[in-house]
C-alpha cells in the first residue's frame, strides 16, 4: 500500500496539491470500484500490474473530486491545468475546443475517474 500512496502523492503534485490526508480511504475506494467492476477480490498486493496505474488514477481523481465538491479548490489556479499529459509512451490530449480552464479540469477529472474503465474489461470475471 505504501507504494500506491507514493504514486498518488506524486500524481497529486502534478496538480500542485501537496497534502492529502485521506489517501488510504480513496485508495481503498478506488480498489473497491475496480473489484466491483471486475468481480474480483484484488488486494493491494495481488492487483495485476495492468491495473496499478488505473488504481492510482482513480484515487487521484477521487481526491480531486472530493476537494472540488468541498470547495477546497476555490483558490486553485485552473489555468495551470495541462492540455495534454504524457505517461510513458502514451499521450492523453484533451479537447482543444474547451473554452475555460474549469472545463478542461472537469475533462481531466472525468478521465482520471472513468477514462480507463474500458481496460477493466480484460480483467472482468463472469459470475455464474
Predicted features along the sequence, with ranges:
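Conserved short "hinge" loops at termini or chain/domain junctions
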Residues: 1-54, 104-128
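Short loop/turn elements at secondary-structure junctions
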Residues: 61-128
Amino acid at each position: 500500500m505504501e507504494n500506491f500512496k507514493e504514486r498518488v502523492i506524486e500524481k497529486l503534485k502534478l496538480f500542485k496539491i501537496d497534502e492529502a490526508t485521506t489517501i488510504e480511504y480513496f485508495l481503498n475506494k478506488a480498489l473497491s470500484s475496480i473489484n466491483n467492476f471486475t468481480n474480483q477480490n484484488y488486494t493491494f498486493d495481488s492487483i495485476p500490474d495492468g491495473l496499478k496505474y488505473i488504481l492510482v488514477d482513480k484515487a487521484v481523481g477521487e481526491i480531486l473530486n472530493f476537494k472540488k465538491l468541498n470547495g477546497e479548490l476555490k483558490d486553485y489556479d485552473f489555468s495551470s491545468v495541462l492540455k495534454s499529459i504524457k505517461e510513458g509512451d502514451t499521450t492523453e490530449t484533451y479537447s482543444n475546443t474547451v473554452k475555460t480552464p474549469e472545463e478542461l479540469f472537469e475533462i481531466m477529472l472525468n478521465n482520471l475517474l472513468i477514462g480507463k474503465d474500458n481496460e477493466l474489461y480484460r480483467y472482468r470475471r463472469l459470475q455464474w
